[in-house]
UniProtKB/Swiss-Prot annotation:
GO cellular component terms attached to this protein's record: cytoplasm; ribosome
BP terms from Gene Ontology: ribosomal small subunit biogenesis; rRNA processing
Subunit and interaction comment: Binds ribosomal protein uS19.
Function according to Swiss-Prot or TrEMBL: An accessory protein needed during the final step in the assembly of 30S ribosomal subunit, possibly for assembly of the head region. Essential for efficient processing of 16S rRNA. May be needed both before and after RbfA during the maturation of 16S rRNA. It has affinity for free ribosomal 30S subunits but not for 70S ribosomes.
Gene Ontology molecular functions: ribosome binding
Organism: Methylorubrum populi (strain ATCC BAA-705 / NCIMB 13946 / BJ001) (Methylobacterium populi)
Keywords, ordered alphabetically: Chaperone, Cytoplasm, Ribosome biogenesis, rRNA processing
Domain PRC barrel: 137-211
Keyword set includes Nuclease: no
Protein name: Ribosome maturation factor RimM
Membrane-crossing residue ranges in chain numbering: none
Biased composition (Low complexity): 1-12
Keyword Chaperone: yes
Length: 224
């Protein structure tokens, strides 16, 4: 979960403080999460993790957990996989020498390396309705941000949030400009997004002037 920020960063893009069978919501965080994936594009689902490479020969696989308590992901029973399957984790443990959110897991029905290889880059999500309501008015799911209007400090609508990706350096807001054209990415920090008004269906952003500027021309090839 995420919480309204009290610092320069809005932190984890994933549910925080999750406990088996008792996930609540996302907190507007204090520190950034380094999860590589955006919030689930389906607002009825909340992203919990992403599979990586196989581990060993007997079906185990690496999993990046997006939950505040990484091992909690194994306690939610059947989960929605991005390839359309329903998958259930049977076992999870911290990956040796890895970051705290990197796990070695076993998936029910997967007992060999080829099955584990087929899981690589597949994400796991949970139905939002299974998570209950936020316990704190400052808590929310990052999927709640998708569809919000983006206003500049003067109150002019400059775009709409279409995704909340995280490529390793902190959460980003992908914004479709109101004037049309390609989307742009804005760091989801208090400096760039000082106001978040879920009830009002908007955020107030203070973006750089060139946020929606087209990329400059590529430098000419060196004739030498």
């Amino acid at each position: 979960m995420a919480r309204r920020p009290g610092s320069s960063s809005r932190g984890p893009a994933r549910p925080d403080r999750l406990a088996p069978q008792a996930v609540t919501s996302a907190r507007r965080p204090q520190t950034p999460d380094k999860s590589p994936k955006p919030a689930s594009p389906d607002p009825s689902l909340v992203l919990l993790g992403e599979f990586g490479r196989p581990h060993g020969l007997h079906g185990e696989v690496r999993l990046k957990s997006f939950t505040g308590e990484p091992l909690a992901i194994a306690g939610y029973g059947p989960l929605h996989a991005s390839d359309g399957r329903t998958l259930e984790l049977e076992d999870a443990r911290p990956a040796p020498g890895g970051s705290p959110d990197l796990l070695i897991v076993r998936v029910k029905g997967v007992d060999n390396r080829s099955g584990a290889e087929a899981l690589n880059r597949i994400t796991l999500a949970i139905a939002r309705e299974r998570l209950g309501q936020a316990e704190d008015e400052d808590e929310f799911f990052l999927t709640d941000l998708i569809g919000l209007a983006v206003e500049d400090p003067s109150g002019t609508v400059i775009g709409t949030i279409v995704a909340v990706p995280n490529y390793g350096g902190g959460d980003l807001l992908e914004i479709r400009p109101a004037a049309g054209g390609p989307t742009a990415l804005l760091p989801f920090t208090k400096a760039f997004v000082p106001t978040l008004d879920l009830a009002g269906g908007k955020v107030v952003a203070d973006p750089p002037e060139d946020l929606f500027a087209p990329p400059g021309p590529k430098p000419a090839d060196d004739p030498g």
